[in-house]
From Swiss-Prot:
Residues annotated to bind DNA: 61-80
Function, in words: This protein is an auxiliary protein of DNA polymerase delta and is involved in the control of eukaryotic DNA replication by increasing the polymerase's processibility during elongation of the leading strand.
Keywords assigned: DNA replication, DNA-binding, Nucleus
Alphabetized PROSITE patterns for the sequence: PCNA_1 (PS01251), PCNA_2 (PS00293)
Gene Ontology cellular component terms for the protein in this record: PCNA complex
Signal peptide span: none
Gene behind the chain: PCNA
Keyword Transport belongs to the record: no
Family per record: Belongs to the PCNA family.
Descriptive protein name: Proliferating cell nuclear antigen
Location in the cell: Nucleus
CDD domains: PCNA
GO biological process: leading strand elongation; mismatch repair; regulation of DNA replication; translesion synthesis
MF (Gene Ontology): DNA binding; DNA polymerase processivity factor activity
Length: 260
Protein backbone atom coordinates (compact mmCIF):
# COMPACT_ATOMS: atom_id res chain seq x y z
CA UNK A 1 0.00 0.00 0.00
CA UNK A 2 1.17 3.51 -0.85
CA UNK A 3 -0.37 6.61 0.69
CA UNK A 4 0.90 10.19 0.80
CA UNK A 5 -1.09 13.09 2.23
CA UNK A 6 -0.41 16.81 1.84
CA UNK A 7 -2.25 19.35 3.98
CA UNK A 8 -2.40 21.72 1.01
CA UNK A 9 -3.07 20.46 -2.50
CA UNK A 10 -1.56 23.70 -3.85
CA UNK A 11 1.95 22.20 -3.50
CA UNK A 12 1.01 19.33 -5.81
CA UNK A 13 -0.58 21.76 -8.28
CA UNK A 14 2.53 23.95 -8.33
CA UNK A 15 4.83 20.95 -8.81
CA UNK A 16 2.77 19.80 -11.78
CA UNK A 17 2.73 23.33 -13.22
CA UNK A 18 6.54 23.31 -12.96
CA UNK A 19 7.00 20.16 -15.06
CA UNK A 20 4.03 19.72 -17.40
CA UNK A 21 5.40 21.95 -20.18
CA UNK A 22 8.55 19.81 -20.31
CA UNK A 23 7.10 16.33 -19.77
CA UNK A 24 3.94 14.70 -21.08
CA UNK A 25 4.39 11.61 -18.92
CA UNK A 26 6.65 10.63 -16.06
CA UNK A 27 7.34 7.94 -13.50
CA UNK A 28 7.02 8.80 -9.82
CA UNK A 29 9.33 6.46 -7.88
CA UNK A 30 8.17 6.03 -4.29
CA UNK A 31 10.07 4.43 -1.40
CA UNK A 32 10.58 4.92 2.37
CA UNK A 33 12.45 8.17 1.77
CA UNK A 34 9.77 9.84 -0.33
CA UNK A 35 8.86 10.46 -3.97
CA UNK A 36 11.39 10.98 -6.75
CA UNK A 37 10.92 11.86 -10.39
CA UNK A 38 13.71 12.08 -12.92
CA UNK A 39 13.16 12.44 -16.65
CA UNK A 40 14.46 14.01 -19.83
CA UNK A 41 12.08 16.49 -21.42
CA UNK A 42 10.16 15.53 -24.57
CA UNK A 43 12.88 16.97 -26.83
CA UNK A 44 15.75 15.38 -24.84
CA UNK A 45 17.33 18.80 -24.27
CA UNK A 46 16.87 19.23 -20.51
CA UNK A 47 16.50 16.99 -17.48
CA UNK A 48 14.04 17.39 -14.61
CA UNK A 49 14.74 16.01 -11.13
CA UNK A 50 12.13 16.25 -8.37
CA UNK A 51 12.45 15.12 -4.74
CA UNK A 52 9.59 15.19 -2.22
CA UNK A 53 10.78 13.86 1.14
CA UNK A 54 8.58 11.53 3.18
CA UNK A 55 8.92 13.74 6.27
CA UNK A 56 7.42 16.69 4.38
CA UNK A 57 4.04 14.95 4.04
CA UNK A 58 1.36 15.09 6.73
CA UNK A 59 1.09 11.30 6.35
CA UNK A 60 3.36 9.02 4.35
CA UNK A 61 3.19 5.25 4.00
CA UNK A 62 5.07 3.13 1.49
CA UNK A 63 5.04 -0.60 2.32
CA UNK A 64 7.12 -1.49 -0.69
CA UNK A 65 8.85 0.45 -3.45
CA UNK A 66 6.41 1.44 -6.17
CA UNK A 67 6.89 3.19 -9.52
CA UNK A 68 3.83 4.97 -10.88
CA UNK A 69 3.84 6.01 -14.52
CA UNK A 70 1.44 8.90 -15.03
CA UNK A 71 0.14 10.95 -17.92
CA UNK A 72 0.70 14.50 -16.67
CA UNK A 73 -2.09 15.92 -18.82
CA UNK A 74 -4.56 13.56 -17.15
CA UNK A 75 -3.12 14.33 -13.72
CA UNK A 76 -3.49 18.04 -14.42
CA UNK A 77 -7.19 17.59 -15.25
CA UNK A 78 -7.73 15.84 -11.91
CA UNK A 79 -5.83 18.44 -9.85
CA UNK A 80 -8.02 21.22 -11.25
CA UNK A 81 -10.80 19.79 -9.06
CA UNK A 82 -8.83 20.37 -5.85
CA UNK A 83 -9.23 23.63 -3.96
CA UNK A 84 -5.89 25.19 -2.96
CA UNK A 85 -6.73 24.74 0.73
CA UNK A 86 -7.96 21.16 0.30
CA UNK A 87 -5.85 18.31 1.61
CA UNK A 88 -4.65 15.98 -1.15
CA UNK A 89 -3.99 12.27 -0.69
CA UNK A 90 -2.40 10.00 -3.30
CA UNK A 91 -3.14 6.29 -2.82
CA UNK A 92 -2.22 3.12 -4.69
CA UNK A 93 -2.26 -0.58 -3.88
CA UNK A 94 0.89 -2.61 -4.45
CA UNK A 95 1.08 -3.71 -8.11
CA UNK A 96 -2.05 -1.67 -8.88
CA UNK A 97 -2.79 -0.40 -12.38
CA UNK A 98 -4.44 2.77 -11.12
CA UNK A 99 -3.87 5.55 -8.59
CA UNK A 100 -6.47 7.42 -6.53
CA UNK A 101 -6.43 11.12 -5.67
CA UNK A 102 -8.59 12.16 -2.68
CA UNK A 103 -9.33 15.83 -1.97
CA UNK A 104 -10.90 16.98 1.32
CA UNK A 105 -12.12 20.50 2.04
CA UNK A 106 -10.74 22.13 5.23
CA UNK A 107 -13.92 21.42 7.21
CA UNK A 108 -14.19 17.92 5.65
CA UNK A 109 -17.69 18.77 4.42
CA UNK A 110 -16.65 17.81 0.91
CA UNK A 111 -14.58 14.75 -0.01
CA UNK A 112 -13.95 13.84 -3.64
CA UNK A 113 -11.89 11.03 -5.11
CA UNK A 114 -10.63 10.46 -8.63
CA UNK A 115 -9.08 7.32 -10.03
CA UNK A 116 -6.52 7.47 -12.83
CA UNK A 117 -5.02 4.65 -14.86
CA UNK A 118 -1.28 4.19 -14.46
CA UNK A 119 1.05 3.70 -17.42
CA UNK A 120 3.92 1.31 -17.95
CA UNK A 121 6.71 3.68 -18.89
CA UNK A 122 9.99 2.10 -19.86
CA UNK A 123 12.16 5.10 -19.04
CA UNK A 124 15.87 4.81 -18.43
CA UNK A 125 17.22 6.07 -15.11
CA UNK A 126 19.93 8.60 -15.75
CA UNK A 127 22.76 9.01 -13.31
CA UNK A 128 23.49 12.63 -12.47
CA UNK A 129 27.20 12.95 -11.68
CA UNK A 130 28.27 14.95 -8.64
CA UNK A 131 29.88 18.13 -9.93
CA UNK A 132 31.84 20.91 -8.27
CA UNK A 133 30.59 24.17 -9.77
CA UNK A 134 32.78 27.19 -10.55
CA UNK A 135 29.96 29.61 -9.89
CA UNK A 136 26.79 29.51 -7.78
CA UNK A 137 24.23 32.32 -7.83
CA UNK A 138 21.30 32.60 -5.43
CA UNK A 139 18.72 35.24 -6.25
CA UNK A 140 14.99 35.97 -5.92
CA UNK A 141 13.10 33.52 -8.13
CA UNK A 142 10.68 36.23 -9.30
CA UNK A 143 13.61 38.37 -10.48
CA UNK A 144 15.09 35.45 -12.44
CA UNK A 145 11.68 34.78 -14.05
CA UNK A 146 11.38 38.44 -15.05
CA UNK A 147 14.88 38.51 -16.57
CA UNK A 148 14.24 35.32 -18.57
CA UNK A 149 10.91 36.63 -19.82
CA UNK A 150 12.25 40.07 -20.74
CA UNK A 151 15.44 38.92 -22.47
CA UNK A 152 13.62 36.27 -24.50
CA UNK A 153 11.97 39.22 -26.31
CA UNK A 154 15.41 40.08 -27.73
CA UNK A 155 16.74 36.69 -28.80
CA UNK A 156 16.44 32.93 -28.61
CA UNK A 157 19.60 32.60 -26.51
CA UNK A 158 20.66 34.13 -23.23
CA UNK A 159 24.25 34.54 -22.09
CA UNK A 160 24.85 34.20 -18.35
CA UNK A 161 28.19 35.61 -17.26
CA UNK A 162 29.43 35.31 -13.70
CA UNK A 163 32.43 37.36 -12.51
CA UNK A 164 33.58 38.80 -9.19
CA UNK A 165 31.70 42.01 -10.06
CA UNK A 166 28.40 40.16 -10.26
CA UNK A 167 26.25 38.26 -12.71
CA UNK A 168 25.20 39.55 -16.14
CA UNK A 169 22.34 38.23 -18.27
CA UNK A 170 22.39 39.28 -21.94
CA UNK A 171 20.56 38.60 -25.19
CA UNK A 172 20.99 39.88 -28.74
CA UNK A 173 18.58 39.70 -31.65
CA UNK A 174 17.13 41.52 -34.65
CA UNK A 175 15.78 44.42 -32.60
CA UNK A 176 18.97 45.00 -30.65
CA UNK A 177 20.50 43.80 -27.42
CA UNK A 178 19.64 43.72 -23.73
CA UNK A 179 21.80 43.38 -20.62
CA UNK A 180 20.82 42.97 -16.99
CA UNK A 181 23.55 43.14 -14.34
CA UNK A 182 23.07 42.11 -10.73
CA UNK A 183 25.65 42.83 -8.05
CA UNK A 184 25.85 40.82 -4.86
CA UNK A 185 23.69 42.44 -2.19
CA UNK A 186 25.87 43.83 0.61
CA UNK A 187 23.36 43.37 3.40
CA UNK A 188 19.65 42.72 3.35
CA UNK A 189 17.00 42.09 5.97
CA UNK A 190 15.05 39.51 4.00
CA UNK A 191 17.07 36.50 2.94
CA UNK A 192 14.75 35.72 0.01
CA UNK A 193 15.54 39.14 -1.54
CA UNK A 194 19.30 38.62 -1.45
CA UNK A 195 21.62 38.06 -4.41
CA UNK A 196 24.52 35.85 -3.29
CA UNK A 197 27.36 34.86 -5.62
CA UNK A 198 29.97 32.23 -4.79
CA UNK A 199 32.67 32.05 -7.45
CA UNK A 200 35.81 29.97 -7.85
CA UNK A 201 36.46 31.22 -11.39
CA UNK A 202 34.55 33.32 -13.95
CA UNK A 203 32.10 31.48 -16.20
CA UNK A 204 30.24 32.64 -19.32
CA UNK A 205 27.75 30.27 -20.94
CA UNK A 206 24.86 30.52 -23.41
CA UNK A 207 21.47 28.85 -22.97
CA UNK A 208 18.18 28.55 -24.84
CA UNK A 209 15.68 31.12 -23.53
CA UNK A 210 12.76 28.81 -24.25
CA UNK A 211 13.94 26.27 -21.68
CA UNK A 212 14.87 28.85 -19.06
CA UNK A 213 11.32 30.19 -19.34
CA UNK A 214 9.96 26.65 -18.87
CA UNK A 215 12.05 26.31 -15.71
CA UNK A 216 10.68 29.54 -14.24
CA UNK A 217 7.23 27.90 -14.07
CA UNK A 218 8.56 26.67 -10.69
CA UNK A 219 8.81 30.24 -9.36
CA UNK A 220 5.73 29.86 -7.13
CA UNK A 221 7.37 26.93 -5.31
CA UNK A 222 10.24 28.93 -3.83
CA UNK A 223 11.15 32.57 -3.13
CA UNK A 224 14.75 31.90 -4.19
CA UNK A 225 16.40 30.13 -7.11
CA UNK A 226 19.96 28.82 -7.27
CA UNK A 227 21.95 28.69 -10.52
CA UNK A 228 25.07 26.50 -10.59
CA UNK A 229 27.48 26.79 -13.52
CA UNK A 230 30.79 25.41 -14.73
CA UNK A 231 32.35 25.44 -18.18
CA UNK A 232 31.15 22.63 -20.47
CA UNK A 233 28.68 21.07 -18.01
CA UNK A 234 24.92 21.58 -17.77
CA UNK A 235 23.53 24.51 -15.84
CA UNK A 236 21.55 23.51 -12.74
CA UNK A 237 18.51 25.63 -11.86
CA UNK A 238 17.27 24.64 -8.40
CA UNK A 239 14.13 25.65 -6.54
CA UNK A 240 13.95 24.46 -2.92
CA UNK A 241 10.39 23.63 -1.90
CA UNK A 242 10.08 24.66 1.77
CA UNK A 243 9.85 21.76 4.25
CA UNK A 244 9.49 19.02 1.63
CA UNK A 245 12.15 18.93 -1.09
CA UNK A 246 13.38 20.52 -4.30
CA UNK A 247 13.08 20.58 -8.06
CA UNK A 248 16.18 20.82 -10.24
CA UNK A 249 16.45 21.44 -13.95
CA UNK A 250 19.59 20.62 -15.93
CA UNK A 251 20.28 22.35 -19.26
CA UNK A 252 23.35 21.88 -21.45
CA UNK A 253 24.96 25.12 -22.67
CA UNK A 254 24.71 26.05 -26.33
CA UNK A 255 27.94 25.61 -28.25
CA UNK A 256 28.71 28.88 -29.97
CA UNK A 257 29.27 28.36 -33.68
CA UNK A 258 32.51 29.76 -35.03
CA UNK A 259 32.11 32.46 -37.65
CA UNK A 260 33.12 30.91 -40.94
Amino acid sequence: MFEARLLRSSILKKVLEAIKDLLTQATFDCDDNGIQLQAMDNSHVSLVSLTLRADGFDKYRCDRNISMGMNLGSMSKILIFAGDKDTATIKAQDNADNVTFVFESPNQEKVSDYEMKLMNLDLEHLGIPETEYSCTIRMPSSEFARICRDLSQFGESMVISCTKEGVKFSATGDIGSANVKLAQTASIDKEEEAVVIEMEEPVTLTFACQYLNYFTKATSLSPQVQLSMSADVPLVVEYRIPDIGHIRYYLAPKIEEEDS
